[in-house]
């Protein structure tokens, strides 16, 4: 799976695009880390919990960077702290306050692909913070906004946005275009395609979003029409 992602990133890079990849932990890893914490205490300290669960993404960014370098793409892995994602101090559910783009711009201008640990940042005291479940979506949208990216692509385990969960309802219809208000409503009603905070962030900063399948290389996904108009 990591090598498949690397090959997809390489295609974009080879076409001359500046690419920032935001990744989450491997499937099941965050739950495994949470279980380890709960084995120690039923009420783990939120600061220590963030310090612990943020390591899942750090493993993934290193693996993807290794994979990219192995196929001839210069890549650099960066944690939320290293990439300059500053948050408040609400451990386990922090909100992004600002992003320093200097480090990213330096690497992008040098022709490198940046692989960023999603779901995490740091507060004013230098503590590691996490953004809550699905926070990697928010990280990706926030970085796209900060860099004024042409588009933010969100890869999921379904090939776009559906009227309902296609894994539960086989007759669910795929939506090619969707307004911001509709996407926000779906997220607020429990749609697992995007984290609601990431949708709010995208609307606020007018980030063009495209939802794509992690398994389908040829699918165009669903595009948020509101964003394209700006």
Name each model feature, range by range.
Residues 1-200, 224-225:
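Nucleotide/pyrophosphate-binding catalytic subdomain
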């Amino acid at each position: 799976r990591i090598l498949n992602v690397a090959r997809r990133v390489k295609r974009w890079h080879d076409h001359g695009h500046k690419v920032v990849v935001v990744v989450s932990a491997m499937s099941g890893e965050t739950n495994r880390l949470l279980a380890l914490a709960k084995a120690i205490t039923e009420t783990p300290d939120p600061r220590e919990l963030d310090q612990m669960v943020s390591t899942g993404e750090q493993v993934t960014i290193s693996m993807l960077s290794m994979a990219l370098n192995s196929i001839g793409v210069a890549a650099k892995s960066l944690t939320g702290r290293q990439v300059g994602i500053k948050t408040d101090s609400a451990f386990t559910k922090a909100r992004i306050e600002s992003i320093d783009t200097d480090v990213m711009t330096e690497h992008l201008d040098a022709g490198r692909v940046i692989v960023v640990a999603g779901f995490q940042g740091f507060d004013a005291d230098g503590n590691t913070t996490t953004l809550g479940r699905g926070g990697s979506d928010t990280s990706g949208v926030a970085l796209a906004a900060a860099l004024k990216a042409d588009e933010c692509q969100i890869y999921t385990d379904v090939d776009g946005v559906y009227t309902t969960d296609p894994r539960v309802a086989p007759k669910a219809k795929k939506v090619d275009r969707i307004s911001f208000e509709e996407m926000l409503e779906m997220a607020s009603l429990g749609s697992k395609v995007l984290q609601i905070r990431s949708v709010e962030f995208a609307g606020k900063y007018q980030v063009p979003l495209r939802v794509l399948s992690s398994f389908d290389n040829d699918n165009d996904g669903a595009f948020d029409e509101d964003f394209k108009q700006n």
